[in-house]
């Protein structure tokens, strides 16, 4: 056999099956693919569904509460906030929540209120468009029904296209997930089981009042402060390096700057706190740190040797949340 024939045969594409040509619903990556192939969705149609397009680095950029939305999606277990819709759907009651039963993207309650979830099992790679897609579907869904995630493309609307982006969110942090069923006379066994499972992960969390987008939490025998910041990553790293080199990056005695989460295009520094500190006691130190950080962000002078070493150390503490 000649090389040219070998190449031709190896590059030939198999004929498209009937399953390839149908519109396959989006399901969890580990679930059986709805096309009937017998494979998991991740290894079948989920492959193309997850690589339809590359989303923006900061999907929630331009929203007044970008950092809080990222916090609700990545580090806050149970929280909710009313959304203000614009255009033809202005006035419709929509609540943004961290997560819904069985990780549904959205749910229309019996009274018509839409609950829109940030934490789901599937996604296109653009969290803003995923939310917008679920919201559009929910606007036409019947009350009492969960809403699945549809096909999202680069032409799909963003959440910013459907809601008021200039009004900061009024976020309520919950101790559990009972807000899922507030006012509901009856709930299914599946929802109750999901509520109980989720409740076991609802670590005590408090949103600080003294600084924006900062959340105290206790996880077992540890307390942390997680603070989502809007600054450009490189600029923020330089400022934090200046503070670290000057030993000004802590929140008081016994506290320690430990890691930086990277998520949805922004950075979330994390501090360890002594057990028993509590949220109230960290309000003033966090505010003081915010003042020091603001000053460091204004400093555009070249980093010193000590600051460059500090910056190198900080980069090793970065963890990307996906």
Cite the ranges covered by each PLM segment.
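Acidic/negatively charged segments and metal-coordination signatures
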Residues: 1-88
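Membrane-interacting alpha-helical segments
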Residues: 2-14, 22-26, 225-239, 289, ...
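Short Lys/Arg-enriched alpha/beta "domain-start" segment
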Residues: 52-109, 167-192
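Generic recognition of long tandem-repeat/solenoid scaffolds
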Residues: 95-97, 114-118, 225-227, 269-271
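Internal, hydrophobic cores of structured domains that mediate oligomerization or house catalytic pockets
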Residues: 110-223
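Conserved short hydrophobic interaction patches
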Residues: 138, 142, 243-247, 289-296
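A contiguous, surface-oriented mixed alpha/beta subdomain in the mid-to-C-terminal portion of proteins
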Residues: 176-282
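Alpha-helical oligomerization segments
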Residues: 254-255, 260-322
């Amino acid at each position: 056999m000649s090389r040219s024939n070998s190449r031709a045969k190896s590059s030939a594409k198999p004929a498209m099956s009937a399953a390839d040509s149908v519109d396959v619903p989006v399901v969890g990556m580990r679930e059986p693919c709805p096309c009937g192939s017998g494979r998991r969705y991740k290894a079948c149609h989920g492959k193309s569904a997850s690589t339809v397009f590359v989303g923006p680095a900061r999907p929630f950029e331009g929203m007044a509460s970008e950092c809080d939305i990222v916090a609700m999606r990545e580090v806050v277990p149970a929280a909710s906030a009313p959304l203000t819709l614009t255009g033809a759907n202005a006035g419709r009651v929509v609540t943004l929540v961290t997560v819904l039963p069985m990780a549904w993207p959205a749910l229309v309650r019996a009274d018509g209120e839409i609950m829109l979830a940030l934490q789901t099992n599937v996604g296109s790679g653009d969290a803003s468009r995923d939310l917008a897609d679920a919201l559009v579907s929910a606007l036409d869904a019947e009350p009492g029904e969960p809403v699945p995630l549809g096909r999202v493309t680069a032409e799909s609307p963003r959440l910013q296209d459907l809601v008021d982006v200039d009004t900061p969110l009024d976020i309520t942090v919950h101790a559990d997930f009972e807000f899922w069923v507030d006012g509901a006379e009856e709930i299914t066994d599946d929802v109750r089981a999901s509520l109980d499972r989720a409740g076991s992960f609802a670590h005590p969390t408090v949103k600080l009042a003294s600084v924006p987008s900062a959340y105290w939490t206790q996880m077992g025998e540890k307390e942390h402060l997680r603070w989502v910041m809007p600054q450009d990553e490189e600029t923020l790293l330089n400022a934090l390096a200046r503070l670290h080199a000057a030993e000004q990056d802590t929140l008081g005695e016994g506290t320690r700057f430990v890691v930086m989460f990277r998520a949805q295009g922004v950075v979330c520094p994390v501090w360890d706190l002594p057990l028993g500190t509590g949220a109230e006691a960290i309000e003033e130190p966090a505010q003081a740190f915010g003042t020091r950080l603001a000053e460091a962000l204004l400093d555009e002078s070249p980093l010193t040797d000590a600051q460059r070493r500090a910056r190198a150390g900080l980069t090793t503490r970065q963890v990307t949340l996906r």
